[in-house]
């Protein structure tokens, strides 16, 4: 779904991501930021192509010792603002990212593998559903990685990009700790 949308992403101004799921009873030794939100952080960094300059974050531990729900607001040097929510204590599973820019609005639903595009057409709004080939993202990531190893070509996500997403996730955790404990 993301691949179908990428061709339309030019200069994001606002991004909103929701990645919610029921309690997993596994992986609760790390916060929802490292377990769940990191996937959206990686995608947002790739789409915005700008450094975050401000981080506001709040996380709450509800059923496990680490944060089970978190919300972060990122302001980027480009002026883009991204608001991300991740939860592993939701009643339903939602995996969606919405992207707003001056010429269009994109809604990407990972779970249902759909992409909707809305554009201004004169005095009307033209909506279209983009063609998406249903795929399993984890299988795609592993296949792409194996292909990179076998062919000695760069992977789809470089080590630097993965490290940047991890570094941002760790900064978010520090901000959440500071808000929660004042340190």
Residues covered by each model-derived region:
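Hydrophobic packing residues within well-ordered alpha-helices of enzyme cores
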Residues: 2-5, 84, 172
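C-terminal helix-rich "cap/oligomerization" subdomain common to oxidoreductases
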Residues: 77, 144-183
């Amino acid at each position: 779904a993301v691949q179908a949308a990428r061709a339309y992403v030019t200069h994001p101004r606002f991004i909103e991501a929701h990645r919610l799921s029921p309690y997993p009873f596994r992986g609760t030794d790390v916060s929802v930021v490292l377990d769940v939100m990191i996937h959206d952080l990686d995608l947002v960094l790739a789409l915005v192509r700008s450094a975050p300059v401000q981080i506001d974050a709040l996380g709450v531990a509800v059923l496990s010792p680490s944060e089970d729900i978190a919300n972060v607001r990122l302001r980027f040097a480009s002026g883009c603002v991204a608001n991300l929510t991740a939860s592993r204590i939701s009643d339903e599973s939602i995996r969606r990212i919405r992207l707003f820019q001056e010429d269009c609005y994109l809604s990407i639903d990972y779970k249902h593998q759909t992409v909707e595009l809305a554009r201004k057409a004169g005095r009307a709004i033209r909506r279209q559903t983009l063609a998406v080939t249903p795929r399993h993202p984890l299988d795609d990531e592993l296949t792409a990685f194996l292909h990179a190893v076998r062919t000695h070509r760069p992977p789809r996500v470089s080590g630097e990009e993965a490290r940047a997403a991890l570094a941002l996730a760790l900064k978010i955790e520090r901000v959440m700790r500071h808000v929660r404990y004042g340190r």
